[in-house]
């Protein structure tokens, strides 16, 4: 999931849609390591900060700690509110209703106490590609520019 964090903010345009995409990723990734079918239960229990990092615990505790870190990091990619647990515990139907009502206006999907409009809470970043992907993209772009330059030179 860590390698696709940038994709979440680039592929989906509105905050409610980003939140739904984030929930889908959290749900699907939870099912890879736990069979309880309730990923919100893992969010409700407030672990001390020392437990958020994988420690000397067994495999389930290690997987849960990693999953919580990744869901938290994925939230921070698309939202600036700092309340990933609040977003996780909000019902999906409330998010979907908010998405329908705010898609064309500045009505926001806000947690209690946060009065910023949705468009101020968006975090729009360039995706962080691995080094091999950056090199490939740079090479591809330079080859494309060279072929475009050759076309321009031949036509003039």
From Swiss-Prot:
Residues 96-111 have a biased composition (Low complexity). It comes from the Viruses. Residues 90-114, 133-156 are annotated as: Disordered. Residues 147-156 have a biased composition (Polar residues). This is Protein US1. It comes from Human cytomegalovirus (strain Merlin) (HHV-5).
